[in-house]
């Protein structure tokens, strides 16, 4: 990527690459509910390991959606196996990143639903990129671009959801 100017191809590429993670993250929220992933475990600090916001159903649904998006990308690119692997790693990684973010928030004594700027927006990105990194090595400028795009997309989606009455807060 030419660091002097971010071109539209780079932006579209990183969005396309991250689609399994983006869709998994959204799907985990939409299809979530039920038993929490941490099974109600409370640590010595008196706080839950992760909390009620990360569930088995959301994790399974999000991982499945990430896999399906990866399969579609694999079909489009002519490499189904790469699509399966990257879709699975990006999708599951996104959900594990979100769970890790919840774990960190609990340790920082931040209750569920309370904001943790940057962590709330990028935890799933870090999880996805870490899990996929053994097979896909992205240049640092693409990683930075992914973070910037994700921040904009996340904020935009939250504002729209707030304006539509789907969220109580704009962030």
Swiss-Prot record:
UniProt EC number: 2.7.7.67
Pfam families xrefs: CarS-like (PF01864)
Biological pathway: Membrane lipid metabolism; glycerophospholipid metabolism
Residues annotated as transmembrane: 11-31, 65-85, 129-149, 151-171
InterPro entries in the cross-refs: CarS, CarS_archaea
Protein keywords: Cell membrane, Lipid biosynthesis, Lipid metabolism, Magnesium, Membrane, Phospholipid biosynthesis, Phospholipid metabolism, Transferase, Transmembrane, Transmembrane helix
Membrane topology (UniProt): Multi-pass membrane protein
Compartments (UniProt record): Cell membrane
GO BP of this protein: glycerophospholipid biosynthetic process
One term under GO cellular component: plasma membrane
Molecular function in Gene Ontology: CDP-2,3-bis-(O-geranylgeranyl)-sn-glycerol synthase activity
Reaction(s) the record says it catalyses: 2,3-bis-O-(geranylgeranyl)-sn-glycerol 1-phosphate + CTP + H(+) = CDP-2,3-bis-O-(geranylgeranyl)-sn-glycerol + diphosphate
Cofactor(s) in the UniProt record: Mg(2+)
Main location group: membrane
Functional note: Catalyzes the formation of CDP-2,3-bis-(O-geranylgeranyl)-sn-glycerol (CDP-archaeol) from 2,3-bis-(O-geranylgeranyl)-sn-glycerol 1-phosphate (DGGGP) and CTP. This reaction is the third ether-bond-formation step in the biosynthesis of archaeal membrane lipids.
Family stated for the protein in its record: Belongs to the CDP-archaeol synthase family.
Protein name (database record): CDP-archaeol synthase
């Amino acid at each position: 990527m030419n660091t002097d100017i971010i071109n539209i191809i780079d932006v579209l590429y990183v969005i396309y690459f991250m689609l399994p993670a983006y869709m998994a993250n959204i799907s985990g929220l939409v299809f979530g509910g039920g038993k929490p992933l941490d099974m109600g475990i409370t640590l010595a600090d008196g706080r839950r390991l992760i909390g009620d916001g990360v569930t088995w159903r959301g994790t399974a649904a999000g991982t499945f959606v990430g896999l399906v998006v990866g399969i579609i990308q694999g079909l489009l690119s002519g490499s189904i196996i790469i699509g399966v692997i990257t879709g699975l790693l990006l999708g599951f990684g996104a959900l594990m990143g979100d769970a890790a973010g919840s774990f960190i928030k609990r340790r920082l004594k931040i209750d569920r639903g309370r904001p943790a700027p940057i962590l709330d927006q990028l935890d799933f990105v870090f999880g996805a990129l870490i899990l996929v990194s053994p097979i896909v090595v992205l240049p640092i400028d693409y990683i930075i671009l992914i973070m910037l795009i994700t921040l904009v997309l996340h904020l935009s989606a939250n504002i729209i959801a707030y304006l539509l009455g789907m969220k109580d807060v704009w962030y």
